[in-house]
Amino acid sequence: MTDKQPKTTYRPHRRGTKTRWLWLPSLMFGDGVAVSVLVLTMVMLRRMGLDTADTALAIALLSLPVLLRPLFEMVVTHFWGTTKVWILSTQFISALSLAAVAFTLHTSSWLLGTVCFMPFFVCSSVFYNIALHRFYIDTSQGVHLSQVHQQNPTPQQDTMVRWCDGEMVTLHSSTSHHHNTTTLHSQKSCGFLTMALLFGCGVMMMIAGNMEVVTRNIRYSWSLVFYIMAGVELFLWLWHTIFLPGGTHGYAKPKPTMGLHRGEFRISLRRMLKRKDDITALTFFILFLLPETLLALTAPLFLIAKPHNGGLGLSPQEFAFTQGTLAVIAIALGYTLGGKTIKRHGLRRWLLPSALLLAVPGAALLFLSYNTAAPLSIVAAALAAGHAALGFALSMVKQVVVRFTRNMPDNTLRHAIARTLIATPFVLVGMFAGAMLTLIDYQHIFLVATELSIASLTVAALYLYRTRKK
């Protein structure tokens, strides 16, 4: 199962511009569907009667494949030239997994079915994300990236498009200075991801809540939602089968994979651990988003928990409006604003303010925990403010990742390690989040999350100090 790569020189892509890019929004939309499904799964488990501690533990365990990303990168590396096959295969597996979960929700073994089939979906989503990041396209002539590196690029070949962490990064090659300058253009890809999250966390959550009211059957309602999500994945698979470049034309090719072959991983890792700047960056990835690690699972559970349990008691429809719609739009706006400020003023000026902004999500939830009877408008405003601040901080994290991987022979491995270290605290803290809720209430958790912004401020200052000469 490999895409055959012809040895002859590639001819320019002759298809129309619109036809060439029909796969562009759908790739990013498919990447956002995975996050939406995890949110839907968490709410579904609570609506089906699973307690808070078990729900948090289940979602954290389902997120474990994210920590195996460097290993998955190695697996994909040994299937050279199969980027399109990975994309299509993982989307088909995702569709089958969601359909299996939807089928088991009607039975008494719904929990066993969810636990058995959801790991297939999560693993396939990680592989899909890896394949997406390796999918290179020349925007002008449709030639291989290796051809551009082996010869002096023409003005038409000057712009390459790379997918990196859900953001389109344009690499402008300069033949006169022989260096690459990276500029971020996140508006389009951020918009596609936002649409996917709005569809999954907003529209589908709203449908589930309305179906619960109409049918008075929770199992049927959520089974229908998962069948629809499986249909979306199947449609994307069919769409990419038709419009995704590759196959006999060979427009897709994996990017350089230094450090992902046998023996190279240890060498690259040792080299990384000997550089003080790299150690500082690795520490930054682990600790900067530490305040958000406590909120990633506890905040949604707080929104849907009953008032007598210390929550707000939002219905699925209200959750879809606040967390699935307004909060998603807010985090996208904050992310876009952060990218613009970095482009205008640079990272050093805004890294410390963004660390302080990480206290806003916890403070907003702390305010709501003391005002559980607040109207829906106040809840929506507080969540929007917190997510806008989080989006602004995430844009800073993204820029640090870009600097960590830029102009490195093992940039693919570095990108995988960076994403793994960012996700590790979320998974580990999420495993104990449910147990923490049985010992302390939401107010204390949100207070601790707000205070943890001190760690973010400290590691941001350390990063600025270590990179001051650059």
Cite the ranges covered by each PLM segment.
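Transmembrane alpha-helices of Major Facilitator/SLC transporters
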Residues: 65-69, 319-343, 361, 426
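Intracellular loop-helix junctions on the cytosolic face of multi-pass helical membrane proteins
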Residues: 2-17, 105-114, 127-128, 132, ...
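Helix-loop boundary and gating motifs at the non-cytosolic
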Residues: 9-66, 280-284, 288-306
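Intracellular juxtamembrane helix-capping segments at the cytosolic ends
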Residues: 127-141, 174, 392-407
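Helix-to-loop junctions at the C-terminal end of transmembrane segments
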Residues: 68-82, 333-349, 437
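A late C-terminal transmembrane helix in Major Facilitator Superfamily
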Residues: 408-439
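C-terminal ends and interior cores of transmembrane alpha-helices
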Residues: 92-108, 356-374
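Hydrophobic core of transmembrane alpha-helices in multi-pass small-molecule transporters
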Residues: 29, 110-128, 374-394
